[in-house]
Curated annotation (Swiss-Prot):
Protein name per its UniProtKB record: H/ACA ribonucleoprotein complex subunit 1-like protein 2
Keyword Lipid biosynthesis among record annotations: no
Localisation per UniProt entry: Nucleus, Nucleolus
Low complexity biased stretches: 162-177
Self-association and partners: Component of the small nucleolar ribonucleoprotein particle containing H/ACA-type snoRNAs (H/ACA snoRNPs).
Role, per record: Required for ribosome biogenesis. Part of a complex which catalyzes pseudouridylation of rRNA. This involves the isomerization of uridine such that the ribose is subsequently attached to C5, instead of the normal N1. Pseudouridine ('psi') residues may serve to stabilize the conformation of rRNAs.
Record keywords: Nucleus, Repeat, Ribonucleoprotein, Ribosome biogenesis, RNA-binding, rRNA processing
Family: Belongs to the GAR1 family.
Region named Disordered: 1-39, 129-189
C-alpha cells in the first residue's frame, strides 16, 4: 500500500490528503471518462424545454419547466431516446434558455421550433437554489447557525498534554488568554 499523496507516512492525520478519510481510494478506477457515460434511459421523463433554433452545431432550447436542469444532464425525446446533454444555461432567470451539445450522429437542424424535449426528474433543481436567500433564513453552511467545529476533541474534554495526541485528534484547546505561541511539533512515540 502506498503512503497518501503529500503525507509522506502513514502516521498522523495524512497531511494534505484530506485527513486520510478514504477520499483518495480508487482514484481513476471505475469512473467513466468526462461524465459522458451513457446511463441508459431513465424510468420516467418530464418535459423540460422546447426547441428554438440550431447554433453552430448545438441546439438552443427555451426552458418550459419550473425547475432548472443540471449541467451536463442528458436530454431525451419523448420516447426516451437521448439526443444530447445540457451544455450552457443562460438568459433571464424567469425565461431561461439552454444549449445542448448534440450526440454524435444527431443534427440540431433536424428539429423544428416548438418541438418538445424531456429530462429525468432527478436531473432538475428548484429555481430557489439560484436565487439569493433572505437574511436569517437557514441557507448555506454557517449562516445564522453556530459555526462548525474543527476536528478537535469535543469541548470540555480538557487539554491533551504531552507528546503525540491520539490519531486524528488535535492537541486540544488552550484556555482563553493562556499561553500562545510556537509550534510544539507532532512528537514521536
Amino acid at each position: 500500500m502506498r503512503p497518501p499523496r503529500g503525507g509522506g507516512s502513514f502516521r498522523g492525520r495524512g497531511g494534505r490528503d484530506n485527513g486520510g478519510r478514504g477520499r483518495g481510494r480508487g482514484r481513476g478506477r471505475g469512473r467513466f471518462g468526462g461524465g459522458n457515460y451513457d446511463e441508459g434511459p431513465p424510468s420516467e421523463v418530464v418535459e423540460v424545454a422546447t426547441f428554438l433554433h440550431a447554433c453552430e452545431g448545438d441546439a438552443v432550447f427555451k426552458l418550459s419547466n419550473v425547475k432548472i436542469p443540471h449541467f451536463n444532464a442528458p436530454i431525451y425525446l419523448q420516447n426516451k431516446t437521448q439526443i444530447g446533454r445540457v451544455d450552457e444555461i443562460f438568459g433571464p432567470i424567469n425565461e431561461s434558455l439552454f444549449s445542448i451539445k448534440m450526440r454524435e450522429g444527431i443534427v440540431a437542424t433536424s428539429y423544428s421550433q416548438g418541438d418538445k424535449f424531456f429530462i429525468s426528474p432527478e436531473k432538475l433543481l428548484p429555481l430557489s437554489r439560484f436565487l439569493p436567500q433572505p437574511k436569517g433564513q437557514s441557507g448555506g453552511r454557517g449562516e445564522g447557525r453556530v459555526p462548525p467545529r474543527g476536528r478537535g476533541p469535543p469541548r470540555g474534554r480538557g487539554n491533551f498534554r504531552g507528546r503525540g495526541a491520539p490519531r486524528g485528534a488535535s492537541r486540544g484547546f488552550q484556555p482563553r488568554g493562556g499561553p500562545r505561541g510556537g509550534f510544539r511539533g507532532r512528537g514521536r512515540a
